[in-house]
């Protein structure tokens, strides 16, 4: 076709002309934009350009399958396209969930939990037995804190008629099943302050303030004087988008703020090669502030989920904390009460506890888990294994 006639045709169909120019520009931008290895906002690895390694039917099929994934992951403006999709779904179609996340009022996001799955029930019973066994082996020393999800505190902010299962009733069941431990019911303590900033809107964790109110209840049960927040400077970090956001990617999400207390206490992360044989690894401060420059800002607390670490405190005696990541923002408060706070995370600690406890003669043992982790962590059973 004559170029002049082509231009004339495009003038007759301006929408077609706009789309043609748009896709041509997008094609050029895709060519010149460097590939990304990782999406911070989605918290996922992105597909890289595949290589054709075998000229065969299967080889070509695999190549084109992977190339389709590559184009999808590396398209120019991927983050913005996802946000635009979210805008359309929530405004035009009134969508109230995305990626397994419920989109609630006040910009809150909640993990969807309609019922207890059989696999969760098995893990739940196994973990209850482990905590009970630990309490029986160390009578009078073990406390258990099972932290409710944000949906328990803010049911009014859930989408209309969202059928969340009865998590608070399950916590009651846990208390009845654990007569050998001191059960710390933190739900009521948190509910008394529910108008405050207790849980992140875009993440599954509680905030540093939520952790403090639970810590106060622990101190009351142990007869301890709580950490004096007014005596320490507060640090803040803005623009935190958590794990709920990375799954839902809602267009109008409000970022969270992380706070922490600037404490001089030291943290030692141990290398473990056998039960009772820790070798000193990294010595550092309580916070990895370098994490504030990346997506997973919450990992700044205690440098993430280390298998075994020790915090040097300003009090007396020793405590062992067996935990999930909820405890990472809780543990710094214990520096006011204990001289040594040992922290075990079974996701990265492959041994039992008896040798560790025998070597350190702890004054107290605290098991601290969120409800969601307690129903899904397949490693906590090690706490119930003698040896």
Go through each PLM region and give its residues.
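Extracellular glycan-modifying ectodomains
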Residues: 1-387
């Amino acid at each position: 076709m004559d170029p002049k006639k082509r231009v004339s045709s495009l003038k007759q169909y301006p929408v077609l002309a706009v789309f043609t120019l748009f896709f041509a520009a997008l094609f050029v931008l895709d060519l010149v934009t460097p590939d990304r290895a990782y999406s911070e906002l989605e918290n996922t690895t992105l597909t890289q350009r595949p290589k054709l390694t075998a000229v065969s039917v299967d080889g070509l099929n695999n190549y084109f399958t992977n190339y389709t994934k590559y184009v999808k992951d590396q398209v120019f403006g991927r983050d913005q396209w996802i946000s635009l999709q979210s805008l359309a779904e929530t405004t035009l179609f009134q969508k109230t969930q995305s990626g397994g996340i419920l989109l609630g009022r006040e910009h809150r996001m909640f993990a969807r939990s309609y019922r207890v799955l059989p696999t969760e029930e098995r893990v739940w019973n196994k973990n209850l037995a482990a905590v009970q066994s630990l309490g029986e082996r160390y009578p009078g020393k073990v406390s258990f804190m099972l932290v409710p999800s944000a949906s328990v505190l803010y049911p009014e902010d859930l989408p209309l008629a969202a059928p969340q299962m009865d998590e608070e009733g399950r916590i009651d069941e846990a208390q009845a099943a654990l007569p050998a431990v001191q059960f710390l019911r933190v739900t009521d303590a948190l509910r008394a302050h529910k108008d405050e900033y207790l849980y992140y809107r875009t993440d599954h964790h509680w905030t540093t303030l939520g952790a403090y109110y639970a810590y106060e209840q622990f101190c009351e049960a142990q007869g301890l004087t709580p950490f004096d927040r007014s005596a320490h400077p507060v640090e803040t970090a803005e623009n935190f988008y958590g794990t709920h956001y990375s799954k839902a990617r809602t267009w109008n999400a409000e970022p969270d703020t992380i706070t922490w207390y600037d404490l001089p206490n030291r943290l030692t992360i141990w290398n473990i090669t056998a039960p009772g044989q820790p070798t000193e690894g990294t010595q550092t401060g309580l916070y990895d502030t370098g994490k504030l420059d990346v997506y997973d800002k919450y990992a700044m607390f205690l440098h993430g989920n280390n298998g075994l670490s020790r915090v040097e405190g300003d009090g007396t005696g020793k405590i062992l904390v067996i935990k999930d990541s909820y405890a990472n923002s809780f543990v710094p408060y214990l520096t006011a009460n204990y001289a040594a706070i040992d922290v075990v995370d079974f996701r990265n600690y492959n041994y039992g506890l008896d040798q560790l406890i025998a070597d350190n003669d702890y004054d107290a043992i605290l098991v601290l888990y969120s409800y969601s982790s307690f129903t899904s962590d397949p490693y906590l059973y090690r706490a119930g294994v003698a040896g």
